[in-house]
């Protein structure tokens, strides 16, 4: 149905029932889908005025404002006041009405984390975790928020499981796989909405290109629309077969996939934006696994297994995963060794001092927890020539970070904020850093391997969840395991040691530069062979029935 027709129909209904909150929320999102973002915000702003006692209305307004804020960060839309600041106000109204609802606590904590408003974020997170541990009932938290906020793998799994139960259809039972003729190539499909200029494509393009056609017949199932960009064209060339599924409903898309007679379907999205896990519900392939998109369990019975390595999911942690865990013998994260290495610009051109120590963290703002930022600021206080380089773009977060620095007597110009940049420019500027800094509970993934590719060592802290252990897997795969610390105290000591020994940092940089094309992390062809063996094992494996 035409989007404008839907808006008109809902508007007419809402005019008759102005206090019907659910109807007005539907109208707001219909306006957004029709391209009228301002109209959507106005609709929800009017709704909270009409029904100020509805936590759902305030939550919907806050959520829409967060969506606008995050769209702004991509560089597609800039300027104006910060939607995040207004979202925080709306979240507080929702919390006043529903202080113990996980569906309110989790996004409110996440929004305050984006703003680096740590006291409030920590208080909300403590309440959320306490409720999750105390209650035996449903504890639905969106998977990204669970991965970002909950540093407890058991609680994380429960939150994602309960979220899935309320949002995804129950899958069909697994059908027996057809017997594959000996010597024929494994038929493998990749399902993604990221077949364009996206971190997943930057990482995995080389894998698709390095598949041995004698071993793997590769199929791409694109649920994103063609942007006409160079990455899309490159990926089209890489795959043996290409299927455009954008615009199809789940059942039709699944039928198209099933018609190709796959042995294994690899979902590359998981619980991330643009995911279409509902396509897997009808089991278009006899074996369905998840790889790369989401760092943790999908807790969905349509997914048989996930791809990991011995570091991100160590032996004994399988109980925290609803799927079977398939481990690669190397870092699970594929990297494209053909990605660019542009020459580094001058430090001055990216807002940095030409001399001195540059400590960088290009993680998104919600990952920057207080314990780590305070350690970094303490390092700046001890080393007068050091600066902290961050990619935080949220206006409230920048203000809070500057305030934290000022409280320690650190001049504001020693906190340097990097704006959004496209991949070639981003990789070029990364080389201006001396040391990349990781965080917990959700650490560096693509940002970490980008730094290592550009010759910048990564200081990390091994966490307790998949999302918090990727940094350790990355540094291990480039021969820098000593950069993976086991506690905050070790992290602090290592940071001080490195800041005090610029020669050691220079040696590490030379190590990364000399061995870049020899490290397992950047051996794309070798990774492809290991991944093909994993796919063959998955195709031949009898997975236990999902609970």
Mark where each language-model region is.
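Short hydrophobic "strand-cap" motifs at the C-terminus of beta-strands
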Residues: 191, 362-363, 391, 418
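Short alpha-helix at the nucleotide-sugar/activated-sugar donor binding site of glycosyltransferases
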Residues: 451-453, 476
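Short hydrophobic beta-strand element within catalytic cores of glycosyltransferases
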Residues: 457-466
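Short hydrophobic signal-anchor/transmembrane segments that target glycosyltransferases
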Residues: 207-214, 370-384
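Glycosyltransferase donor-sugar binding loop
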Residues: 222-227, 387-400
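Short acidic/histidine- and often glycine-rich active-site loop of Leloir-type glycosyltransferases
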Residues: 468-479
